[in-house]
């Protein structure tokens, strides 16, 4: 128990730098995304929330997550967990708790490559066999606090109890945001 408390205390100390607040929006042909985060763009602990809507069939995903960012030079590694509400249209409405991580590689001229993936097996969901989401792309920050993004997002489920597996979100997007 003491080791856990000491370890958690060290993580808090390592992440005690100023935490930036970010607001982002993404749009694709069939998807709208709104995202708010605290501490996601710097090393240490972070929290974020996200709402994703497939504008074609009305599927919605609402998420809140937390995790830890580890900066190693120009690379930031992320490990995290989310609580996600899946508002599917094929009888798969429910909750999932995906676990995953990501990587961001800072490049010259304020460009960056990023990617992340999260998965929740049947034990961490109540309505589907598996929930998977992935997101990756390129970002550019021409001036602080503006960030512009181009990427690809996927989210899908494997059905359970006779319901078919299907794709919830799938496609390229453009986006932008502000980080204060």
Describe the predicted segments one by one:
Residues 138-142, 167-180:
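Outer-membrane beta-barrel "beta-signal"
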Residues 42-47, 72-79, 109-115, 140, ...:
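Repeated loop/turn-to-beta-strand initiation elements of outer-membrane beta-barrel proteins
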Residues 30-34, 41-43, 58-64, 75, ...:
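Residues that define the transmembrane beta-barrel architecture of outer-membrane proteins
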Residues 18-68, 175:
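Short glycine/proline- and aromatic-enriched beta-strand/turn motifs that initiate or cap beta-hairpins
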